[in-house]
Amino acid sequence: MVDIYGRSLGRVIGIERNAFGELEGVQVEAAGGLIVTAKARQLGLTPKLITLTPDWKLEAVDIISELSLLRKRIGALESLKDTKEIEGEIYTELLDSQKVGYYDKVKTAEALSASMKHRLSEIGGQISSLTRYLVNAKLDHKSGELDEESLKLAQGSIEPTLHPLIAERNDLTGSLRTLEEVLPSRVTVSPTRQ
């Protein structure tokens, strides 16, 4: 099993099914014997490979879609009110129900944004460390302290880890930017006019 960035995650050791026999998730034995559970919606299946999409990525797509839809619905509701196509009482009732859903999604999105920023920080630290090791190996090679074969060994050890981290960082950055675009800087709804 690999993630969408190409990193090996381990081997599948168990499959979870619901009462109807549908796939619910899999258990993966990761490095060090750690058992990790992946939900079915995270899995991409091909004849030769199972690919795992990070949960944050799926959640971000869902939340972005839901927040965008809720904003459109609130805007449409206000438009109906402004053109007097609905009564004030119905407007207030519908607006209150939309606001509750919107506020809940905003809170969920803010929590997801915070966890994505934390992951981005972790990845940034790992990329920085690996890049430093790679630069030091190249520096040692240029100064004659490290032979060509040792440099290739160092590069062969570092680069397969570095490239997926860079891909994940770029993916996280893009998803975070899109998520923050749909998050309001502050939440306001125009006062009720009847």
What residues fall within each predicted segment?
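Peripheral interaction segments used for macromolecular assembly
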Residues: M1-V187, P191-R193
